[in-house]
Amino acid sequence: MTSESWRTIPHSAAIYEADITDFLEFFKANIKPKGITLNTVLLKAMTMGIKNCPQMNGHIEFNRRLVRGKIETYKDINISMPMIMPSGDMMTINLHNFENRTLENMQSYILDVKRRMKKTDLTEAMFSVSMSDTLSALKKGKLITTLGRLIGAKTGRHKVVTSRGKDKKNYNSIPADERLTKENIEQGTITITSTGSVYRGSHNTMSVIEVIPPQISAIGIGSISEKPGIYTDRNGEKQIGIRMFLPVLLAFDHRALDFGDLTPFFKKLDDIFATPEQMLKW
């Protein structure tokens, strides 16, 4: 998917940096005591932004030879989010139907995913998705793509080795609600990754992330950092002080979107970070 992404998608990106000082203080005083993590709150904020800019939440099909294609947007927001397995490996999880979930529901959903990860065989899970994608490509007439995937998966030094016999039977006997299945790691409608949760306090800022086809957008949440900034105090006066800033990267497929199409997303984030009281209604 990574090689296909860079080969077929004309990537463009915008880096958004928000002063979240007041937002962070409100979160610590009113939301964190309820057991809700900052990652969950930021995920909710991104979801609200996506709802305000539905063009982001979609898939594109494009025929390069005929120079034509179609874009399909979705009401359901199914988030592809990379998460670290107990083994230390990375797996992209599909967080289904996050468009209307409350903070509490989002938090419990993510905790349940982490619980099920403990009994999940990464190779088996990824192979099931790969075969499903391959069959889907075959149904669309993509014979060369299908053959390439099958040959790559089953031959050579890097072939996929799945369990067999008794081991496979034992793994398949684990109830679906106790492990992650194909439905949990299949393609979502949009990708959100949080590098800030992996390396807190990092001074890095992402400049680009890959858009996974057929998705048309990907969001990267960076690490919160202290910086001098200009803000308005309670008396309405401009001041300079140490503030907390959050970088957010939005990468998109330029065939489907222009920067102007994305302004509703950024304006919604502006509103959320300026009036954190709305978190109480989430």
PLM features per residue range, with description:
Residues M1-W282:
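C-terminal catalytic/motor cores of large multi-domain enzyme assemblies
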